[in-house]
Regions:
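A beta-strand/beta-hairpin structural motif
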Residues: 90-93, 100-116
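Extended extracellular/luminal ectodomain segments enriched in beta-structured repeat modules
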Residues: 49-56, 122-123, 157-159
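Internal, hydrophobic beta-strand segments that form the core of beta-sheet-rich folds
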Residues: 121-157
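C-terminal motif of bacterial Sec signal peptides marking the signal peptidase cleavage site
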Residues: 16-19
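Start-of-domain marker
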Residues: 23-86
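Bacterial N-terminal signal peptides that target proteins for export
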Residues: 1-8
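Beta-strand elements of well-folded, non-transmembrane domains
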Residues: 60-64, 77-79, 92-94, 131-135, ...
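Short acidic/polar inter-strand loop motif in beta-rich domains
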Residues: 63-65, 108-121, 131-140
Length: 160
């Protein structure tokens, strides 16, 4: 009887968590990279959208094997007649060599802003990203970038 009484609040809490949805998040998806990102692996996300103004961000999950304190990314967004290509530079550390998104575990989640207040049209939106990190004395990107576990894309309604 006591066990049944304990299950009821647990089940209610679980139902509440599952039913909660952040109305500002229009799209969220991750792709697992199994700990390394090859330079030829262009990650692609496709989502349907209605006309709106959005904020687009990447979420990188890294571990202690990631050898750099920054990352360079090349992204492209195709929506309607728009096709925008950008280079993104992101520093994981501040001037004091502290990670911006430091966490207790060895896995770090970093949210990288790609576009703020971006107007998308109704229809299919295609987003692609690849890494372009290289050593200082090289013009070629790293063949394999260790320590990258997952790459995610989050599209949220803009506050403006």
């Amino acid at each position: 009887m006591i066990k049944q009484k304990l299950y009821i609040p647990f089940i209610l809490a679980l139902i509440l968590l599952i039913s909660c949805k952040d109305e500002n998040i229009l799209y969220l998806d991750f792709q697992n990279l199994n700990g390394n990102w090859h330079k030829n692996n262009e990650i692609e996300f496709n989502f349907e959208s209605s006309e709106s103004v959005v904020d687009i961000s990447l979420i990188l999950r890294t571990d202690n094997l990631y050898p750099f304190s920054n990352i360079f990314l090349i992204s492209s967004i195709k929506n309607g007649n728009k096709n925008e290509i950008d280079t993104i530079s992101y520093a994981f550390e501040n001037d004091n060599k502290k990670w911006y998104d430091a966490q207790v575990s060895s896995i770090k989640n970093s949210k990288i802003s790609v576009k703020k207040h971006f107007k998308i049209d109704s229809g299919l939106t295609n987003f692609k990203v690849k890494h372009a990190i290289r050593y200082l004395d090289s013009i070629m990107p790293q063949t394999k970038l260790d320590g990258i576990l997952d790459v995610g894309l989050i599209v949220e309604k803009s506050n403006k």
